[in-house]
Amino acid sequence: MAKKHSKRYQQLLEKIEKGKIYSIDEAVKKVKELKSAKFDETVELALRLGVDPRHADQMVRGSVVLPHGTGKTVRVAVFAKGAKADEAKECGADIVGAEDLVEQIQNGNIDFDIAIATPDMMGLVGKIGRILGPKGLMPNPKTGTVTMDVCQAVKNAKAGQVNFRVDKKGNIHAGIGKASFSEEALKENLETFVAQINKLKPAAAKGRYIQHAALSLTMSPAVELNTQELMDIKG
């Protein structure tokens, strides 16, 4: 059965030229015109990559700090003890703990957006891997969230670090800002994000790397992006 869209959504759809492939500049301008919600909508980038994530050598995963942030207030939890716990608090972590934090999470109290851990804490954090993993909250060295430099990791998270991971079908979704951002800020965030994706292209990936790309707002239809323009972005 075909999905029925609201009248508002249909009106937004009429603003998008059917079948058109948009340049980055055009797409950013267009999505800002599609703002219709009462809240400050997130600008969302969706990519489909030519990779098979079932093979370990084709997994695309990492993180990037967006130059203009995400526009989102991020709550950061840090698993650390002693001097590293003190360092995390001084650098702005919202929650710092060890066994007590693990217990909170086991009891269903997850009040954070990003989790960071010192390497020595990963044995403990592993106990709640089944809880954090599906939510995309498990600390990982590839995203810079398992580190001794907890201060920098907290600062990156607060500054707008976006962690990403390709799903089983080769898709990556990321919020790259808010509808209230300037066109220039959104463009720079998008290009910074895509440059990192290009940098992480697996050697084993065959054929076209970015197969499909679209930009949208939380409550809007998507506009299709020129994938060649994206693949030409270098970091």
Curated annotation (Swiss-Prot):
Protein name per Swiss-Prot or TrEMBL: Large ribosomal subunit protein uL1
GO MF terms held by the record: rRNA binding; structural constituent of ribosome; tRNA binding
Matches recorded under InterPro entries: Ribosom_uL1_bac-type (IPR005878), Ribosomal_uL1 (IPR002143), Ribosomal_uL1-like (IPR023674), Ribosomal_uL1/biogenesis (IPR028364), Ribosomal_uL1_3-a/b-sand (IPR016095), Ribosomal_uL1_CS (IPR023673)
Subunit details: Part of the 50S ribosomal subunit.
Similarity annotation: Belongs to the universal ribosomal protein uL1 family.
Alphabetical list of PANTHER family matching this protein: 54S RIBOSOMAL PROTEIN L1, MITOCHONDRIAL, LARGE RIBOSOMAL SUBUNIT PROTEIN UL1M
Function: Binds directly to 23S rRNA. The L1 stalk is quite mobile in the ribosome, and is involved in E site tRNA release. Protein L1 is also a translational repressor protein, it controls the translation of the L11 operon by binding to its mRNA.
Keywords: Repressor, Ribonucleoprotein, Ribosomal protein, RNA-binding, rRNA-binding, Translation regulation, tRNA-binding
A UniProt-annotated Pfam family: Ribosomal_L1
GO CC terms of this entry: cytosolic large ribosomal subunit
Keyword check for Coiled coil: no
CDD domains according to UniProt: Ribosomal_L1
Signal peptide: none
Gene source species: Nitratiruptor sp. (strain SB155-2)
PROSITE patterns, per the entry: RIBOSOMAL_L1
One GO BP: translation
Superkingdom of the source species: Bacteria
NCBIfam families assigned: rplA_bact
